[in-house]
Amino acid sequence: MNKIYSIKYSAATGGLIAVSELAKKVICKTNRKISAALLSLAVISYTNIIYAANMDISKAWARDYLDLAQNKGVFQPGSTHVKIKLKDGTDFSFPALPVPDFSSATANGAATSIGGAYAVTVAHNAKNKSSANYQTYGSTQYTQINRMTTGNDFSIQRLNKYVVETRGADTSFNYNENNQNIIDRYGVDVGNGKKEIIGFRVGSGNTTFSGIKTSQTYQADLLSASLFHITNLRANTVGGNKVEYENDSYFTNLTTNGDSGSGVYVFDNKEDKWVLLGTTHGIIGNGKTQKTYVTPFDSKTTNELKQLFIQNVNIDNNTATIGGGKITIGNTTQDIEKNKNNQNKDLVFSGGGKISLKENLDLGYGGFIFDENKKYTVSAEGNNNVTFKGAGIDIGKGSTVDWNIKYASNDALHKIGEGSLNVIQAQNTNLKTGNGTVILGAQKTFNNIYVAGGPGTVQLNAENALGEGDYAGIFFTENGGKLDLNGHNQTFKKIAATDSGTTITNSNTTKESVLSVNNQNNYIYHGNVDGNVRLEHHLDTKQDNARLILDGDIQANSISIKNAPLVMQGHATDHAIFRTTKTNNCPEFLCGVDWVTRIKNAENSVNQKNKTTYKSNNQVSDLSQPDWETRKFRFDNLNIEDSSLSIARNADVEGNIQAKNSVINIGDKTAYIDLYSGKNITGAGFTFRQDIKSGDSIGESKFTGGIMATDGSISIGDKAIVTLNTVSSLDRTALTIHKGANVTASSSLFTTSNIKSGGDLTLTGATESTGEITPSMFYAAGGYELTEDGANFTAKNQASVTGDIKSEKAAKLSFGSADKDNSATRYSQFALAMLDGFDTSYQGSIKAAQSSLAMNNALWKVTGNSELKKLNSTGSMVLFNGGKNIFNTLTVDELTTSNSAFVMRTNTQQADQLIVKNKLEGANNLLLVDFIEKKGNDKNGLNIDLVKAPENTSKDVFKTETQTIGFSDVTPEIKQQEKDGKSVWTLTGYKTVANADAAKKATSLMSGGYKAFLAEVNNLNKRMGDLRDINGEAGAWARIMSGTGSAGGGFSDNYTHVQVGADNKHELDGLDLFTGVTMTYTDSHAGSDAFSGETKSVGAGLYASAMFESGAYIDLIGKYVHHDNEYTATFAGLGTRDYSSHSWYAGAEVGYRYHVTDSAWIEPQAELVYGAVSGKQFSWKDQGMNLTMKDKDFNPLIGRTGVDVGKSFSGKDWKVTARAGLGYQFDLFANGETVLRDASGEKRIKGEKDGRMLMNVGLNAEIRDNVRFGLEFEKSAFGKYNVDNAINANFRYSF
């Protein structure tokens, strides 16, 4: 029977001895004998023994002890600074160490895996075979086939298979150090400069909870942990030294019968890891006086047993042939060895090379072990269809084994080690894999695959490499591992993953893998997805109960959902349970006490008080529990069609959504749990189960991205945080924001429906990485409805919002940002134009009689009658807007305003109105009114009420100010008066005065025709000048010119001018006459502080050039040009105008080329250009004032005089002519007159004459006999308008 020894003082030996369970007052345990009713595991009790609770649940909950041992709840491996809430509401903090990984403990806790096929326990467990002879890890049962023990109660065991579920406990604890060194290395600071060694024990002995007996021993569900501190490193006992510890006084879990052999762990500060100190031996004392004794790990004995199972085979890159019980390498042959128990050993291969099997090989309890960083091939000799069977395959780090034989079909292949197993042919058996990589290189490589432990990877290297069935023959147990699709597509009905230790990935960066999950009923995938993957859930017909519920991390290229619901949520943290079965229907006299009910009852009162019934309900998780693990979902695009998307609690989602005929619910209150989570894999590891429950569970959820939706609906629930940071469009898709939700749109949002909000809605511009904020536009055709008291509607930071707002509740509205909130903000020029210089612009009506509005640096364009309870305006503008003769009224109970403007429209009888019912206060506010013109002979003044406020309101609230309207300065004449018990501001008339600056801006715009004419003039005679330099014949030519110019008032322009043409030479008596035709295209841009725009011009002309033998010449040209103009003005409300115009040109130039030498010359010249420029006229209204701006047709006459000098340089096959010129260009006629007309009368601005000095340098080159190339640079100075820089290049081909 399994003993937990009690340690007593012996007078005979003079020391402590281990006393058996049969002695008086010693706690003990055995198997209850098989009765006729049933076989059960029980505890032998003695009436004269007092049993203390092994788990004290007066302070901590029962579940906490189980969570720790099973790495559930907060006790995830590696977690630090862990604390739990005690029943009195205080926190209990565990040592500031990472939580150990207890996966190396066997399910019943009586033994501990140390890796490979080895486990440790205590020697006296041999008397109870149910304790450690059979060990379960995950879904695999292992059997002890050999062991070695010591007199100090230590036992090292050899198991029948390599353990795949764990890499085993670290056994590097050095007990041979002196005590102080051990304390220094493994101790924890406890204050006052002292260190203590603190550790954990994991076991499932005879379990009780504060007097609640379970009658259970070796029950996996009841695996629990103890927290202790070591009190004696070398307690002298029978058989040798033991380590003595005492349990923590708060988190108290005493050692009991059945805990013999359970692992004890301490932390190695030097290596930063947990190590196995030893195995539990026995106890002395009871309750708070209990001391537990630990047998230290014995590395010497462990190595001795391992050596019994090692046969080294050094292949050294040769071939090892195995057959007939022998191994042959070259000329050397050795027998396959067995140990003294006639058990096969592990064949430990080294050196790399080939292994050839001549026949089936059954190593029994021995396996294949391969060393690190080598390449091996295992194959059959010839074409033999041979198989291998054994304890498993262990491949060292960096090594790859090409496996080209089969494993025995009546057994499961166990694979461990960090190296890779490349399976080349189908195995027709099952695989259990833990560490390293298994590459599947054949169709249906294994019937089923069991993936355990976490670090392992299964990689696809062939089509249909997995098995068949709903789960494709692959099962991921606790901590799972990776499935690498490696560029292959894979379809599942369900993925058999028990927790988030499972990841499906694609390491192939060039070929995307499609992962299809086609569950026909509700299903939760607990694992993760990452890599180059597209995730699909497509059904042929719409099914509302075929939800794909994702509660692991998802990072995919895209997700596509059709005809089925998709749920993204966090995961309710898994916890330990007290019994796998939900109820115990067996009578107590046969099956023992129903401890689950007793625990629930014992903790009921504190659970009712703390609302923590979920802690005692024997469920893996509960919808009401507060601890949920947040999951991240990342994708580029999520496409859903005829489907629904739910983003529930603890989901953090980023990506763009495209939805058609679908429902989107962000912050869905419905969540899903799986009562078998963490326990989904059953049997031998190749079956899967789920028990899905749903209900209300509200927690924070997040979505960041954009939504493009058509014919659907979007609901955003409580505690949802939504950030729309890319453009979103909702077409026939209603958006509802519920109370408690927080939605921020930082990019444009357009909807053809309405937006209902009971939560917080914020519309804002987008902040770029440079710190600059770019504007965003928001348009809701159906408007915005605020449905809850306290609902917040905020627009700020370059938001331009359009859509009516209404609310019957006490909502809060805010437009704009105070200067202190955006002092670091940089605004783009586009934003300043779009927002009229304000931080925020809103256009629409507000009907919210119970709501308040705060405006800071904001513009409100009031488009309909509006009503508010309170309006607070600072540095803002309320601009009444609407159709012709449709006026609006803004009614508020209280108005507080400062440094703001209210701009109204009126006719001779009506006007927009501001009505303040209860209180109007503030100062330094402008009251502005659009201009109106009185018609006929009505000489009476106006009498139009604009503002009505409570009686005796200060007259200083509003003041008037001169506005520039049209080309005039307009001052409305407004008086305040007490009328009908109210303070009223009344418009009585206007005062208008011409504004010279506005007229100057208009004149600058209208002068564009003259500057365009001048640009064409400067390019008019270029071709004829070239003819004199090239001594050419008939030919075709092309020219491109680019230049910039500037004038006063901030005017600047630039142009690109292209000419093409052809001409012919006529040799006459005493002269050469060239005649030709030209086509031109000009693209010019011009602007100033007041306007900007462009002109595109096309033209055609004829020219002639007569060059006399004497050196005299005459050039003539005629040309027509058509102009298409588009200009945008920022003055007088002109806006953008498109118009066409044209011009005619007639030019003549005379000169004389005087040759100083044969290659140098001087050329005086004179030019006269006459033309016609068409006029234009614009008529419009600016703030109610009629405006006209016109310039008439005019005929410019421009003269130019100057002198050019040049010199030719030539060689055998080339000639270059360089030239420079200086001239003066001047207007003989003033350019056109501009006529401006507005309410202050007509203004005529006469055109002025201008003149400028011209300078140019250039050259022409003969590249070949019939090819010429020219280049020229120009600029002008001393004019009102000057060419800053110009360059032209020409090319001619002579026939």
UniProtKB/Swiss-Prot annotation:
SMART domains: Autotransporter. Residues 54-304 form the Peptidase S6 domain. The keyword Acetylation does not apply. GO terms for molecular function: endopeptidase activity; serine-type peptidase activity. It is an enzyme of class 3 (hydrolase). Its EC number is 3.4.21.-. InterPro entries: Autotransporte_beta (IPR005546), Autotransporte_beta_dom_sf (IPR036709), Autotransporter_pectin_lyase_C (IPR012332), OM_autotransptr_brl_dom (IPR006315), Pectin_lyase_fold/virulence (IPR011050), Peptidase_S6_dom (IPR030396). Cleaved to release the mature protein from the outer membrane. The keyword Secreted applies. This is Serine protease pet autotransporter. It comes from Escherichia coli O44:H18 (strain 042 / EAEC). The lineage of its organism: Bacteria, Pseudomonadati, Pseudomonadota, Gammaproteobacteria, Enterobacterales.
